[in-house]
């Protein structure tokens, strides 16, 4: 750990005062992935199966794994810096930094203040967002609310997790599922991808998906989680579409939490969508928890899949249980 140093506090930034409601949008994306990619072979050998068994059950062929000296904060900083560069935003102009994560390097401090300081956003409000795999959507709602209420002008939202460090290598249910990574988005008034509506939900289901302070690894009832994940994401999407007065046919691309291939396909089938209308990057990345939605957004942009005029529907499900959906609208689409 680097030696502590006493910093001169930056003067507090006066907060914008509330005025009439304005819309928030996304001005740029960024992502960061560890260099090491691990295929199914070593995991399969450890749990006594063939690599194809893992691929068939999960749709995952490989995942990124952080090095021993590579922390969550480093990935978040890299993704955040790339998003700020893509949005042409000076870090000193950022009003808030939110980091959605379940795997911060320390219990305290949270990751967000460290990320903000490293990026040069020293006057920004900063905090971590929980809700596991749903964390990025929760952060999207929080960041958009800050902008819409005129409490902030520029928000850096990062989803980052390194759950390979919290995985039991001998547990067939979870050993092959998780990967590490970070994705980020810069939120500003009237950005290209207008945010909203956002819906979030939850229910108490602790014993079927958790990391406790004793084992410190993910424990999961896979069948129970699968059923509820598909159902709750479908429910959240239908609720959002009703609020937005849209039909699923009005949506150009669906980005569901990249939990595994079976869950992504099940959500797709619930809505009768063709595969090319649903983002699926899980084969190469695995389940990156809070990073999965922003990573998929960044990759979809690079692949030319985000519409110039149209709608992108985001949905996620995580421990808690927690779930949600959010709509991004590009261009002047009504």
Regions found by a protein language model. Name each.
Residues 3-5, 73, 77-80, 103-104, ...:
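Claisen-condensing/thiolase-fold acyl-transfer catalytic domains that form or cleave C-C bonds
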